[in-house]
Amino acid sequence: MKKKQVSHAIIISVMLSFVIAVFHTIHASELTPLAQMAEGMERQDVSIDKWTLHAKQNLSLTEKEFYQKVQRLKQEYRQYDWVIAREDKMIKAIGTYTDKKNRTSFRLQLVTTLKKHNPTSYLLYEQMSLETPDSWNDTYEQFERETLGIFQEKVVIFTCLNGHLDDNMNIVLQKKANQLLNEFQARSVEHVVEPNFVSISAFTDEWEEYIMTSKHKMNLQIALRSAGMGGKHTVTVGTPIVTTEY
């Protein structure tokens, strides 16, 4: 009788483990990258301070076409404050808008190089906030809809979250970085480890988009920095972008 009870208990335990694993898999598949990152950071006791979403569209505009597009953007996004900056061999139009109530800022940036042949141009759209939204999923999906309206096509969205760990926690940076990797079922492809800084480039099958390093696919970056004894531990998690363009 006892053997049967033990056997039944083992079967039930295995079934429960299977159900929980399936639930987590289904739950993760329903989440946007922004929501997955936020939930993963929160499970690792990271308090989120700021989040940013970026989208970019490559274009090819002459100087005349650049100004024509700027006029269209100004008419469509009248709530934005616009400035035009001319640099050495480049011209930029930057539009900014701030939702003070929700501590959220928006930026549109149109850039083109001043070349006679094959000018390089791109349009950037960015949303940044210091507030935690009611729904990470809804926020990401709203941004997707906005990018479709701006770019008139589906583009890749880049995600970045900045946060911090409790100053009183005894943190080993590399260990915490590996725990964050595990949250996203990611594997490291490149890393830099210093006494007060850890940076990891990684790849996860959770998301379709990726960029290539010299040898590997990469679609996740994790960085942790400590200010030293008693200092704040900062954490950044995001999908890889060419930051100099932003």
Curated annotation (Swiss-Prot):
Organism of provenance: Bacillus subtilis (strain 168)
Record key words, sorted: Signal
Taxonomic classification: Bacteria, Bacillati, Bacillota, Bacilli, Bacillales
Protein name: Uncharacterized protein YwmB
Residues in the signal sequence: 1-30
Keyword Metal-binding: no
Gene3D superfamilies the record matches: YwmB-like (3.30.360.40)
